[in-house]
Structures are given as structure tokens and as C-alpha cells.
Amino acid sequence: MSDKQSGDGDNKLLYCSFCGKSQHEVRKLIAGPSVFVCDECVELCNDIIREEIKEIAPKQKQDELPTPKEIHSHLDDYVIGQEHAKKVLSVAVYNHYKRLRNGDVHDGVELGKSNILLMGPTGSGKTLLAETLARLLDVPFTMADATTLTEAGYVGEDVENIIQKLLQKCDYDVEKAQRGIVYIDEIDKISRKSDNPSITRDVSGEGVQQALLKLIEGTIASVPPQGGRKHPQQEFLQVDTSKILFICGGAFAGLDKVIEQRAHTGTGIGFGTAIKDSSNKSKEGELLKKVEPEDLVKYGLIPEFIGRLPVLTSLEELSEEALIQILREPKNSLTKQYAALFSLEDTELEFREDALQAIAKKAMSRKTGARGLRSIVEAVLLDTMYELPSMSNVSKVVVDETVIRGESKPILIYDSAADKKSISE
């Protein structure tokens, strides 16, 4: 639509070339070569494109869902050991996204949601498994700490803030958020303080479990856009949490004793009594594999909450050999990460085998699992990383067992000299 003259002189009233509205009827008019488009038409075009993408995207992604074997294989690249947990997760995640892509109801049968509960000691790989799954599937991922959550109306973090964080990860794209994965850590810390409900309010225990129930099962969560504070006049984003996969994790210290106690209940006195031999007690990891919902109720989780987490799996405590593998084998292993950092300074970093063994031993003694490996390596290499950028001609840094034990400094090998020097020289 050509410009129309309004009044005398150079005053021209401009019109949108698409809808015909004047510049006074719209908020903004964008100019192009001899044409104009208003903000309302731009928004309308965006809506049309979004709707078309929604129709095309599911068809494109139908063939992209990896099989359980492919998911397991990808997890193998980043997570050492935990074969049973990886198999359980691969199947549960595959079924969840198959359900999303084919609808909740198939041939008249409603497909239930497969949220997951991971049990295992600190540093056994619970968080890494969840992160790796999200990265493989290219879906938004967020973590929450159950210990910071409280019931609505109390000081602390509201459970709906979890969905807020997920939206932030995908620029408040609701469709993307609804395909996301939420990992809630330290879930064992919100267990009820005793088997009997207390008269007093337990705002960080059973109360949080009650608050999480609907969120995990599936509800329409109202979240303020762009992180704004809630107020009555504000439009909320509506997020359907029934499409979000929730993975809850915790160490569940002492749960093995609950399982063991159940295994020995019902035994009588006399000849039929099973003798409890401490030398024949199963390891904690083996006991966790035998967990039943009733054990989790005894531990302090309410039955309704356990019912929303139908997939239960446990992770074993990592052995010294597994920790050495973690240091060396995964695609993003610690030794490879630090070697890449040193390569940016044109320096090669070498960890000798006895150094890896010493790091694993130290992590085992600290009982921090794989999580403690980085802090050990960081402390060992701190002085070297501080000095190296100011030094020249260092071609290689070697770390051996004595360095890990604090008896010596890393060995520096120079280009210009055949001799070796330590960082302290």
C-alpha cells in the first residue's frame, strides 16, 4: 500500500502495507523499501510460523529418538560402571519420550508416566547420568536441591521455582520446557522425621513431599514470565508438567539397614530362626538392589510420593579401579580436561599410572566418590597452573605418585634444556 498524504507539506500519514492500519493505530511501524509492516502483523506472522513448526517438528523428531541400546552406549562414553542403572534409565527414558511422541493414550490404553528414583552414595554418578541423558536427547535440563524447598507460604524455595529454572534454560519456550528433564537431588533429606505423622508442621519434610506430588505426577504449573514476581494482573505461562521427566536422587544413608531388617522380620525363636551372621551380610549396594516401596515408606517417604516414582534403581559405590577408569577413560575425563587446558599453553600434561592410583586412593579415603576427584587434581596442579603462563619453553608437565602425596612438585620438561626441573626450582 502506498503512502497517503495527510495534511499539507511534508506530513505524511504512513500505513501498514499488509493490514492497512495507520501509524497512529499501531505501536510500531517498520519501514522497508517502499513498504511498511506494523508490529501486529509481525506478531501474527510469528504465530503462523510457530504453528507450522509445531506441526512439522514432531514428524521430524519421530525418527530421532535413540533406542535403549543406543542410549546405553552413549552413557558408556561418559559414565563408568553402573551397568544395571544405565539399562534401567535407558528403558525408562525411551518409554517416556515414546509416550510423548505418540500421545498419552494408545489403542484406548492410557500410558503412565515413568519418573525415576536413583539411590546411591555420594559421587556414584547420579547427577552425571541425568545430565548426560539430557545432552543426548537435546532437551532442557535443570537441577534442584530438595533441601532448599519448602511448602508454599514458608520461607524458602517454592517447588514451582523448579519449573521457572527449566523455562530459563530454554528462553521461556513452554513447548521445549515440557520436553525437559528435571533432576531433584538430596530427595532422601525430605523424608518424614518419624513413621507417625507429627502434630507440628514439617515444612521441609513431608510438606515438601506433598507439594512435589502434583508437580511430579502432572499438573498445569503457572509460572510468571521472564522471572517476574507473581501478582494478580500478570499473565502466567502455563506449563504441563505431565510431559516433563522427573529424576529424583539421593544417598539414602541407612536404607540398607531398613531393607536388612525387613529381610529378617518374621523369623521366630528356636530351630526355625535364621541366624544373623554379620560376616554373611550383603554389601550396601547389593541390599539397595532389593529395595521395595515399603522400605522407602519406613525410611520416611510418604506412599503417595513413592507411587509417583515407579522406576527404582540403585547405584553401587565406586571401587578404586572404577575411579581410575573415570580419571582416564570417559570422553570428558578429568585427565583429558586438564590436558586440554595445558595444551592451550602449548604444554603437554602427563599423569603417570601411579599418580592415577594415588588420586583414586585419596578419593576413597575421603569417601567422596568421583565427585572428589576434581578437587584433588585441582589442588595438585594449582601451583603449576599459576606459574605456567608466566614461563616459557615448558613442553611437558609430568605428575607422579609423589606429587599426589605432597612429597614433591610436578616435573617440568623444557624445550631448551635436556634437564628436568620441578616447579619449585
From Swiss-Prot:
GO CC annotation terms, alphabetical: HslUV protease complex
Cystines in this chain: none
Binding of Zn(2+), residues: 16, 19, 38, 41
Pfam families: AAA_2, ClpB_D2-small, zf-C4_ClpX
Start and end residues of each ClpX-type ZB domain: 3-57
UniProt xrefs under InterPro entries: AAA+_ATPase (IPR003593), ATP-dep_Clp_protease_ClpX (IPR050052), ATPase_AAA_core (IPR003959), Clp_ATPase_C (IPR019489), Clp_protease_ATP-bd_su_ClpX (IPR004487), ClpX_bact (IPR046425), P-loop_NTPase (IPR027417), Znf_CppX_C4 (IPR010603)
SMART domains: AAA, ClpB_D2-small, zf-C4_ClpX
GO process annotations (BP): cell division; proteolysis involved in protein catabolic process
Transmembrane segments: none
Keywords recorded for this protein, A-Z: ATP-binding, Chaperone, Metal-binding, Nucleotide-binding, Zinc
Residues reported to bind ATP: 121-128
CDD domains: RecA-like_ClpX
Molecular function GO terms recorded: ATP binding; ATP hydrolysis activity; ATP-dependent protein folding chaperone; protein dimerization activity; unfolded protein binding; zinc ion binding
Family designation: Belongs to the ClpX chaperone family.
PANTHER family documented for this protein: ATP-DEPENDENT CLP PROTEASE ATP-BINDING SUBUNIT CLPX-LIKE, MITOCHONDRIAL, ATP-DEPENDENT CLP PROTEASE ATP-BINDING SUBUNIT CLPX-LIKE, MITOCHONDRIAL-RELATED
Subunit structure: Component of the ClpX-ClpP complex. Forms a hexameric ring that, in the presence of ATP, binds to fourteen ClpP subunits assembled into a disk-like structure with a central cavity, resembling the structure of eukaryotic proteasomes.
Job of this protein: ATP-dependent specificity component of the Clp protease. It directs the protease to specific substrates. Can perform chaperone functions in the absence of ClpP.
Protein name: ATP-dependent Clp protease ATP-binding subunit ClpX
Source organism phylogeny: Bacteria, Pseudomonadati, Pseudomonadota, Gammaproteobacteria, Alteromonadales
Gene that this polypeptide is encoded by: clpX
